[in-house]
Amino acid sequence: MTFAVNEAMRPGLRTGMRVMVQLGARKFYAGIVSRLHDEPPAYKTIKPIVRIVDEREAATPEQLRLWEWISSYYMCPPGMVMRAALPAKLKLDGYSEDETLRSGYRVPLVPHIGLHPAVGSEEQLHAVLDSLSRARTQHRAVVEYLARAGFLPGEEDDSRSPEASPAAQYPAGDLPDGEIPVGTPGKGGFAFGEAPLVPRAALGVSSAVIRALVERGILRQVDLERQPGGEDSFAVEGAVIAPLPVLTDSQQQAYEAIRSGFAGKEVVLLHGVTGSGKTEIYIHLMAERLAAGGNVLYMLPEIALTAQLIERMRGYFGDRVVVYHSRLSDNRRAEVYRELLASQGGRLVVGVRSSVLLPLPHLSLVVVDEEHENSFKQADSAPRYQARDTAVVLAGLCGAKTLLGSATPSMESYYNALCGKYVLVALTERYSGVSLPQVLLSDTLRAARRGEKRSHFNKLLLDRIEEALVRGRQVMLFQNRRGFSPFVECGNCGWTASCPDCNVTLTYHKSDGSLRCHYCGYHTPLPPRCPSCGADDLQPRGFGTEKIEEALAEIFPDAVIDRLDADTSRTAHGYRRIISAFERGQTDILIGTQMITKGFDFGNVSLVGILNADNLLNYPDFRAGERAFQLMMQVGGRAGRRSEQGAVVIQTGQPSHPVLAQVCSGDYEAMARMQLAERQSFLYPPYCRLISLTLRHRDRTLLWEAANRFGDSLRRVFGRRLLGPEAPPVDRIRGQYLVRFLLKIEKQSSAAEAKRLLAGLFDTLHRDKAYRAVELIPDVDPQ
């Protein structure tokens, strides 16, 4: 959108700055200036910019160009890209201009205050504050601040701070009688928490008001000792900078090959087997770039991986290390963003998918570890970007180099290397010289026929677990499904518990006796009897990590067993507790979902068990073979990483499956040849581009009418390249029905032209009032 700039504002306005604009009669929003020009738009009325929010830019030129590319390539409005890139504290959402704002009063731009859970409504807070002396003006300030901060019902607001407020910014003396921790709002009430301190004066209230609120239990006063450093801080005071790790001969050769590759190409793919020491090579490359004054971005697929690596990176690079992920507080994310925006180089940014959207001036190197992981793809909401591919584009915009690393590279990256677009560097030896783990297949059908199965475990796996425990070794077991069982069924009438808003069965979680939907979050207690026939015969079917944990505890009662999945690691503390205990040898057996496959380095693990390989092999997707190989090789690579060869036991009903043969031999090249040949025959990536198109609406009949009409229009333009419409495996989520199309675009065809045609055809459909409420969700390069 185009807005007018008045003469007084013009000298101080630059691209990348945040400005406030008015949309509608009383709504104000913030945007970022992407271009300054004197070309009049097609529409007549041009609204003026209300004010400039900051004195300096909030985005770099490279960021703006990257956002523009993301918007165009991933078919997403530029405003949504901006919202994804900016930390919450740097966004100014729409708010209504009310009497308070018109009179000049502004909500203080400071962090939220934590309230006691007993204060559950605005009326209660009004009553308390009204009883205080001098309460009238202060009552208004506090209540309106809390409402705008999200603790109490109120209008949309612009109370998110444009400047972060770090804990060390204000001394304790600025606050009455000690320090007051600030908190975060909880669902349905208020919860105590911790966040940066704020000066009492910033709220415009007296010490008496604060004391009265504390006495009445609304606020809680806690004296805190300021802690330097920490996982998400910039500096580690007194940190010892360790010498760089010594590279083995094979690592040194790979390091030199990467440097040579960068001389001729922008991207290098490092294919190193599990345990080969890719991280040591990364460290040497990072040190070289940091010493030259450049910034380095080190991207990981999961938050779960950051804890182990951050400690290690800080040992080498000290306070140059910056951490960025979604579990940081809003204030911390804003602080990191501001710090990087002003950076003059020499920073190592360790982050997950969203870190590619940070301001990174003087960017010199991007390292994407475990580049094959599909968690680099944003799938749940727009912009649906692939962070690995976006990182390659970002590096190109900044004149930086990109290193992609994996033991099992994605077919897309491997194909690019085979075609000469990337340089391929191989690292085939393990760091310690230990052989890759021995892989054993255990036939579940044969074990059942012979009576060699107990619970969900074949005799071979149980024997190996017992042997490892006797020798004081640790075991990791992989089951790619959390919960106790996938569904509950009535043994009398066949009734199954289903989600009322999604077309899926509810997963039974025995720990809290609940049935949960893993799509929308709906949960309900397990009924004592069948709601359909009244029989007392509800049976859990299938098995998840929780059920595996219970069964193992019965078989090995003396073993210490723990579980790492989305349920047990909802908080950073829960995750760290589980990993730390296993790392210190306090846990004998660790059961987990895909979280345990991601690059962990535990020296005492001698055995890895994969409980159900068939679920991976039989998944209805053209990438199933590739992903099954990657998962099994990655989780298997956790075994035997130090002084002795480990073992991997894979339970399967298909022991002759070709992918399992490739896993047993560790033959990535054979797997890649097979997968690439199949995809070339049936025209799938990397031999074409894919765009998934999902239509969504609450009325199933109307949705299919719209889908058939849209499909006819698409087929007239794209012909046989269009697949669908079809219902996805889960065709209703959160009360909305789904219909999908898949569009194939040949490499030689223009993807931009195809996207332009798609947008035009959907606009035509939307012009029909009957289908105006039907949503289109495009997903470019779906995973």
Q: Across the structure, where does each feature detected by a protein language model lie?
A:
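Accessory, non-ATPase domains that flank or precede helicase/AAA+ motor cores in DNA-metabolism machines
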Residues: 1-406, 418-434, 717, 742, ...
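A general secondary-structure junction signal
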Residues: 35-37, 86, 223-225, 479-481, ...
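Helix N-cap motif at beta-to-alpha junctions
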Residues: 698-700, 744-751
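Inter-lobe coupling/hinge segments of SF2-like helicase ATPases
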Residues: 242-248, 252, 264-704, 712, ...
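A carboxyl-terminal module marker
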Residues: 712, 716-737, 776-779
